[in-house]
Every structure is written in C-alpha cells, then in structure tokens.
Amino acid sequence: MLDPNLLRTEPDAVAEKLARRGFKLDVDKLVALEERRKVLQVKTENLQAERNSRSKSIGQAKARGEDIEPLRLEVNKLGEELDAAKNELDALLAEIRDIALTLPNLPDDEVPLGKDDSENVEVSRWGTPRKFDFEIRDHVTLGETLGGLDFASAVKLTGSRFVVMKGQIARLHRALSQFMLDLHTEEHGYSENYVPYLVNHDTLYGTGQLPKFAGDLFHTRPLEEEADSSNYALIPTAEVPLTNLVRDEIIDEESLPIKMTAHTPCFRSEAGSYGRDTRGLIRMHQFDKVEMVQVVRPEDSMQALEEMTGHAEKVLQLLGLPYRKVLLCSGDMGFGARKTYDLEVWLPAQDTYREISSCSNMWDFQARRMQARCRSKSDKKTRLVHTLNGSGLAVGRTLVAVLENYQQADGRIEIPEVLRPYMKGLEFIG
C-alpha cells in the first residue's frame, strides 16, 4: 500500500508515477475525499471536546445543588452527534483505504517507461544456445516418449493444466528442487522454511493478492462469504506465507537482513491466460517453485535486489542453461513491485527465451500493509522494513529447460553434472 501521507500531500506526483504504469488515478476524487476527511476530523474533535466539557459541568453543577437535567440532555445530544460524526468519518476512511488498496506500487526512477513486455530492457546474457544437428523435440514430446510426463492421466484426475510425472522424470523434478534449496541455504545464506499451503485473507492482503487479484486464487469458500477462521486460499507462491512471517512484528535492525527460502507447490487459476501456453508445463494450475524472500533495512533494498537476482542466476549457471536478464518496464511490473528483473531461459523448441524467475523489490509496499517494522538499538523510533522476493527457480519450467537443452539425438536426456549426486550418479534418462 502506498504511503497515505504521500497521497494526501502529493496526489499529482503520485498520479504522474502511476500513469507510467498505465494506471489512472482520480486525483479530483482523492482531493475531495481528503478535504471531507479534514472537515469531519475537526468536527469530531470539536464535538468530543464539547462533550467532555459539558460532562465536567454536570459534576460541578451537581456540587452546587443546581438542576443538572438540562446539562444531561445536552450531553446526551452531543453524544449522539459525536457518534454520527465518528460513523461518517469511519465510513470515509474506509472508502479512502479501499481506494489505496487498489493502487499499485510506484515505479522506481530507474524503471524504463513502457506499456508491456515488448518494451522491457535486456540487461545481459549468459551462455550460448546449443546448436543441434538433429530435429529438436519439445519437452512434451520428450517427456511423453520417455514415459515421464502424463498429461492424459492428469486430465482424467483433475482437468487441463495439470500433469502426472513418473519415474526418472519425477525424480529429476525432485532433484532440481533439492539442488536449489541446498544452493540457497548452504551458499547464499537463506534459512529453509516449511510453510502452510493454505492461508487466510489477512495474509493475502499483507502481500497484495487481495483485494485486487482474488480471481487468480483458488478459495476454499466463495470469496463473497464473510471471512472467518475457515476461509482460506491456496498459496499462489511461497512469497505469501514467507513474507507474512514478519507481519505485525518489530524487528531489531541488527538482525536484518532476514533471508528465507521454501519449496512449495503454487496454485493459480490463470484466469487471464485463456488460450496461452496450453501445451506442456509452461503455464499450470499447480506447479512447484523454490522461493527466496528477503526482509531488509530500507537503505539496503536495492543492493539486496541485485544480490537476490544473482542468486537466481547462479542456479541457471550451475545447470549450464543459457539465459538473459531483463529489466521490466513500468507497464509490465507486478502490482506490488517497485523494480523487477526477470530471468528468461533459452528453450530450443520454442527458439526463444521464456521467463523462469522474477525478482522484485517491493520497497515498503507490503510492509505497510503488514505493519512490519524495524528499530535500531540507538533509536526508539520504528520504521517500515523493505521486502523482496524472487523465484529461485520455478521448478517445472527449469525441468522444461533441462529436457530441451540436454536432449540427445536418440531421445535420451543428459543429466546436468550438478544434479547427478541427487540422481544416484545417473548420467542419462532413457
């Protein structure tokens, strides 16, 4: 959520930055609501002061033996007016908050202006795409031929955009996630976490999935029903539970940064992607991901973004997968992000780079929603932390990249060297 003080004092500047993201802020409405809030705030405070004064007068009049009934009636009337003013102010504040919850984060000044992914800026490339002297097969053909990817059974069990993995392909999928976790915990300084796959609405508000993206989630009960302790949603990413671990906390600055990782399934309705990537593992309702989250001091967050992106890059480098690093333009960034890098891995069968990791600095956007703060020993004042998240990596898409980049002419798949210890020394599948 954006800083309410910024919305109050610099609405035009906020509107200009939001316009870079293609979002139109109704400044006139916001200014009118703010003016009304000021009036109601003063009215409420004046009524409260007047009521307190009159209440005090009752005691004084009673001590003098005077008739207190007129004063008592006046105090009761003031109380009714005060309650009405408070209710009106609360309703207005709720309206302002509802507007604030729909506003995306402001883009950093370094973010290039653009409408969509066609205007993202390539930062660098690593590795050289392999040249094949045989006809390239895509991951679906490779996986089905090897008996390791069974989409037909998944359709029978559930529906489209699901898969059953079997045998050595399933084992390779597991090996990838174990390799990623080991790398991040043993070399990159993250602590491993096991988190719930179902979360409540407060958690989803904290990281920004609600209220705007309710339709992208799988809910245990209709969202229209009143939220209670049994109203959950499946996590779209481990970012949600991991980041919310610091919700409503005041953290000693000396303990920052906090670096967390988790391997979880992720569940997404893909409501806005009808007809896109219908073949294979690229866009699934259920997929695994190893997530990285950092909670840092505000002054450290941009450097932390570079570090985190480097951690995701290291996975690809050790796997020997060619990729490119892209800085997202203002129109392509996620709702809560201030600055984002995407890593796109080379997929030979598609003859293009496809997203495999997204690393974002969320600034204080999530922290303000979660009321996650930090405090130094030398200063009693608290301040909002900054939060970051990144894929390290999407396991299914990494499997796709390994299958396609390491395929052999005879249909076998070579196992990348770093994965062989997780596969009991196996060098090839098939």
From Swiss-Prot:
GO terms for cellular component: cytoplasm. GO terms for biological process: selenocysteine biosynthetic process; seryl-tRNA aminoacylation. Its EC number is 6.1.1.11. It is found in: Cytoplasm. L-serine binds at T237, A238, E239, E291, S391. It catalyses: tRNA(Ser) + L-serine + ATP = L-seryl-tRNA(Ser) + AMP + diphosphate + H(+); tRNA(Sec) + L-serine + ATP = L-seryl-tRNA(Sec) + AMP + diphosphate + H(+). Keywords: Aminoacyl-tRNA synthetase, ATP-binding, Cytoplasm, Ligase, Nucleotide-binding, Protein biosynthesis. It comes from the Bacteria. ATP binds at R268, S269, E270, E355, I356, S357, S358. One of its GO terms (molecular function) is ATP binding. It is an enzyme of class 6 (ligase). Homodimer. The tRNA molecule binds across the dimer. Belongs to the class-II aminoacyl-tRNA synthetase family. Type-1 seryl-tRNA synthetase subfamily. Consists of two distinct domains, a catalytic core and a N-terminal extension that is involved in tRNA binding. This is Serine--tRNA ligase. The lineage of its organism: Bacteria, Pseudomonadati, Pseudomonadota, Gammaproteobacteria, Enterobacterales. The gene is serS.
